[in-house]
Design a protein with these regions (language model features):
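Positively charged, low-complexity intrinsically disordered leader regions
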Residues: 1-32
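C-terminal helix-to-coil terminal segments
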Residues: 2-7, 11, 264-288
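Anion-binding alpha/beta catalytic cores of soluble intermediary-metabolism enzymes, centered on
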Residues: 6, 96-157, 198
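Short beta-strand segments enriched in small/hydrophobic residues
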Residues: 33-42
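Glycine-rich phosphate/diphosphate-binding loop of Rossmann-like nucleotide-binding domains
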Residues: 41-53, 137-225, 234-248
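Short beta-strand elements in bilobed, periplasmic/extracellular small-molecule ligand-binding domains
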Residues: 58-73, 185-188
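Short, well-structured alpha-helical segments in soluble
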Residues: 78-90
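Rossmann-fold NAD(P)-binding glycine/threonine-rich loop
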Residues: 108-128, 230-280
Length: 288
């Protein structure tokens, strides 16, 4: 697959959609019905947007969804009761909890209640631990989206990566995926010394600092590949963490924001659902 310097997501997105459509049809032909549950608590506008976007995407792909919406003042006990019901339901293969949740609830507690094999957000500590241990796991969609780009760029094994993020949802799982693929990642953060020099010496820079304009021309070279994971709102406009206009004519490749990594994530959740179905099928065989 060839890309111009600005590597938009459309070629990758078309490929992912094609794979998903074929795989979901295959499951249906075998008599299986991919189904997921999405739990939303409260009235957060951003949560509402993503909630509806997932329902729309599921409908397009032919995935059954059970959408549960609870009031802003829902008690932890009531939320847990609904969550446990989803967990016990054998017809639901994947569960997601929209964030943020209201103040009386703890998102991490809720997510870690979900068995790893139904946690299609890849947000539980167990899934992260399984990934780090080389065991079957469901991985968060953002690191998976980065790996889709890595694969398409045909980056040689052994290449060096500067991963500017150390969170358990992006930097840490991504670094493990890179290691598993025989790349050489360095996880960077706000206290990393000589970060600009480290970025310049790396083959690939994955920037997810959460700061608009963080990555500038002083941190890249003509051979740099920049994968921008940042999503920031600046004066009503969505921008990444890289100073896009400043470096797009310098670097080898750069992913845009919007239209880059973020465009892939909603589809990769459904890839996780299919993977979850496989894990649950294996568990059923082992139990029986």
């Amino acid at each position: 697959m060839s890309f111009i310097t600005v590597a938009g997501a459309k070629p990758l997105l078309d490929g992912i959609k094609g794979r998903l459509t074929e795989a979901i049809k295959g499951e249906r032909d075998k008599g299986h019905s991919p189904a997921m549950a999405i739990l939303r608590i409260g009235n957060d506008p951003a949560s509402e947007f993503y909630f509806r976007a997932k329902l729309k995407k599921a409908s397009e792909l032919g995935v059954e969804t059970r959408a549960i919406t609870m009031d802003e003042d829902a008690s932890p006990q009531d939320v847990m009761a609904h969550l446990d019901q989803m967990i016990r339901d054998p017809l639901i293969q994947g569960i997601m909890i929209e964030s943020p949740v209201p103040g009386q609830l703890d998102y991490k507690t809720l997510v870690n209640r979900i068995p790893w094999y139904k946690d299609i957000d890849g947000a539980s500590y167990e899934n992260l631990g399984r990934l780090m241990s080389g065991m079957p796991a469901l991985v968060a969609a953002t690191p998976l989206a980065v790996m889709e780009y890595v694969s398409s760029f045909k980056i040689p094994t052994g290449s060096t990566f500067a991963v500017i993020n150390r969170t358990i949802t992006v930097g840490r799982p991504l670094s493990q995926l890179l290691l598993n693929s025989n790349f050489t990642p360095t996880v960077c953060h706000s206290k990393t010394r000589n970060l600009a020099a480290l970025c310049r010496s790396s083959d690939v820079i994955v920037v997810a600092a959460g700061k608009p304009g963080f990555l500038g021309s002083e941190m890249v070279t003509a051979d740099s590949i920049v994968i921008d994971v940042g999503i920031n709102s600046v004066k009503g406009k969505i921008v990444g963490d890289a100073r896009f206009d400043e470096i797009k004519d310098i670097v080898k490749y750069i992913t845009p924001v919007p239209g880059g990594v973020g465009s892939l994530t909603s589809n990769l959740i459904f890839s996780n659902l299919l993977q979850a179905m496989g894990y649950q099928e294996e568990r059923t065989k082992q139990i029986s």
